[in-house]
């Protein structure tokens, strides 16, 4: 399992740990990832993703998973999240036609 957010592509960064005597040693800054189950309104089912806490805040700010994925570019999404975005778009495209009938 990679240490990368499935929604924002936030990953591991490298840098230096600097001691009191200014000796620099390499270190890794790991993203704060959590396993979360989102409810998709369009799909009508729960979706489990591994996301950063920053992404959780962004999803909440945009009004849910469906709204977040609608605005996100496919390039920054994981394959699983990109497939979800396509499925949600397909489902929403089919809704107006079903309502008009």
Curated annotation (Swiss-Prot):
A matching Pfam family: Ribosomal_L28
GO molecular-function terms, A-Z: structural constituent of ribosome
Domain of life: Bacteria
Matches recorded under InterPro entries: Ribosomal_bL28, Ribosomal_bL28/bL31-like_sf, Ribosomal_bL28_bact-type, Ribosomal_bL28_sf
Gene Ontology biological process terms in this record: translation
Keyword annotations: Ribonucleoprotein, Ribosomal protein
Listed GO CC annotations: cytosolic large ribosomal subunit
Family from the record: Belongs to the bacterial ribosomal protein bL28 family.
PANTHER family attached to this UniProt entry: 39S RIBOSOMAL PROTEIN L28, MITOCHONDRIAL (PTHR13528), LARGE RIBOSOMAL SUBUNIT PROTEIN BL28M (PTHR13528:SF2)
Name by which UniProt lists this protein: Large ribosomal subunit protein bL28
Species, as recorded: Rhodopseudomonas palustris (strain BisB5)
